[in-house]
């Protein structure tokens, strides 16, 4: 009987670089109010959102990803040819096949890197980060590019008072590579498929194709149910991630939750009893909810503005449609 040779990977993995891309068009709440009966004050009080970015025709999922990835690769101090795998998390690449990751890998100039898409909604970045960590430790890649990218404006119903103001577009990317010490903690992840109706696409693509519906599919959600789930259940998941990493809330430097809603963020901070010394990402105010892109975009902005620094210990958690979630403690690049 032949024995399979064991893989030889790095002892640990870490985030080496981060990059982001926000579309050029900035959309204030006043534009949203043209199609819904609401007010700027109501939107801000309910979500914290003041503006969001919407992509133009040239700012495709692939184009935004390439821009963000180029910055992440440069920040990591490597070349595109060294990237061994490209993982893209998105729900707004409207071709079932091929995966947009293959186009991105090619246009970046990788050397035939493995490339694939994943669909895990707003938790997608955490899922991709976990896969990348495993690939590096297992030895199937030395450097992995993880991208979260969305054009949620394409799936926004501007007449839906509950969601019209929420969503934005953008791309965030990180390079994950080898490390001699732990820098990405254990992932606490999972799904609650019994709550699938809480956040969903209004109708399947096939219904639209067959003429069964007149309106283009959009994302809808049960706002109160999502809020309660995020505040009460996701705070527990975040605490589990801290416990698994052996890090106390008082020892954190940064908290980067999915940028869904500032009220949710505030409630999680309170439930986790985070001290005032912890920097909390609030990119949602000017970027809106960008689903899979929200965590890397928020991470990039904190580092760019100096609110966080390389080497800081950060708790990251994503949660959304599925319902799915993923949380871990990481060292910032």
UniProtKB/Swiss-Prot annotation:
- Description of how activity is regulated: Inhibited by thiolactomycin.
Q: Which domain of life is it from?
A: Bacteria
Biological-process GO terms, alphabetical: fatty acid biosynthetic process; secondary metabolite biosynthetic process
Where in the cell?
Cytoplasm
What is recorded about the protein's domains? The last Arg residue of the ACP-binding site is essential for the weak association between ACP/AcpP and FabH.
What family does the database annotate?
A: Belongs to the thiolase-like superfamily. FabH family.
Q: How does it assemble?
A: Homodimer.
Biological function:
Catalyzes the condensation reaction of fatty acid synthesis by the addition to an acyl acceptor of two carbons from malonyl-ACP. Catalyzes the first condensation reaction which initiates fatty acid synthesis and may therefore play a role in governing the total rate of fatty acid production. Possesses both acetoacetyl-ACP synthase and acetyl transacylase activities. Utilizes both straight and branched-chain acyl-CoAs. The order of reactivity with the various acyl-CoA substrates at saturation is butanoyl-CoA > acetyl-CoA > 2-methylpropanoyl-CoA (or isobutyryl-CoA).
This chain's protein is named Beta-ketoacyl-[acyl-carrier-protein] synthase III
Q: Which species does the entry assign this protein to?
A: Streptomyces glaucescens
Q: Which gene encodes it?
A: fabH
